[in-house]
Amino acid sequence: MARVAGIDLPKNKRIDVALEYIYGIGKRNAKDVIAKANGQIDPTTRVKDLTEAQANLLNTILQKEYKVEGELRREISGNIQRYVDTGSYRGNRHRKRLPVRGQRTKTNSRTRKGKRRTVGSKTK
């Protein structure tokens, strides 16, 4: 199992698919990383068939040119925290755990709001 950017890649998958297991790398970036390897890595190569040199090459490309995993997560959470600290509308929506980008909340938005809680009326 090859370890790239601190992640164990699944050994039976092709390298272009396996790179998508790294947070911050999608289909497009995975193909770009392989292209930047200057033909040293074939996209159809399985992870188990990668040599140590090829794995190191992937590591160096990812470290130099991409923000992935912890670094990317820290940047995103820092951006959200900046909105919250400035007291902006987006920050308040994040603080209240409501949709940030203008979606309706009378119905839907269950992902952000969580499981339904009944707000019943009290009998007199």
From Swiss-Prot:
UniProt keyword Signal, yes or no: no
Composition bias type Basic residues, residue spans: 91-124
Swiss-Prot/TrEMBL keywords: Ribonucleoprotein, Ribosomal protein, RNA-binding, rRNA-binding, tRNA-binding
Name this polypeptide is given: Small ribosomal subunit protein uS13
Region described as Disordered: spans on this chain: 87-124
Known partners and oligomeric status: Part of the 30S ribosomal subunit. Forms a loose heterodimer with protein S19. Forms two bridges to the 50S subunit in the 70S ribosome.
Organism listed in the record: Elusimicrobium minutum (strain Pei191)
UniProt key word RNA-binding: yes
